[in-house]
Amino acid sequence: MKNRLVLIVLLVASFFIFLFFYNKYRVAPSFQLFQMPLYDVQGNQTSLESFRGKKFIITFYASWCRDCLVELKALNEIKSARFPDVEIICITDDPPEKLSDFIQKKNYPFRFFRSTKDFPELKIYSIPVNYLVNSSGQVVMEKVGAIDWEDNSLVTRAMNLLQ
């Protein structure tokens, strides 16, 4: 009887561990970035189509996400020196007033947009999620979780991928 109880507890624990990692590292493999409708801070609808032909980094973030805030701060610190010709595009599913407050409070030189859908509807279950897109419109790197922008080798790799 004791062995059966231990087995049941292990199976249940294994199931929840599996679900945690499955959701944490799951990103939509055929994500249509350029067709995704977005709203700017003024409430105007737009899409990433207007960035076609440019190099850009997209980060899906939330104002309450600690890892997202750390990553945005690090990106801000290296943007002008390491990525002067790369647009940084930040997409949130926060309400419009939170987006506006966040932009005013942080004053980052990034482009901020609000998704028309909640992240789970986009199959984004863990944030931040980052995409590096070259000037040909190809996603050259995607990463679930914060990128360590203080790691010089990673920044160099990102710069090379964006070329």
Model-inferred region functions:
Residues 1-4:
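Positively charged n-region of N-terminal signal peptides that target proteins for export
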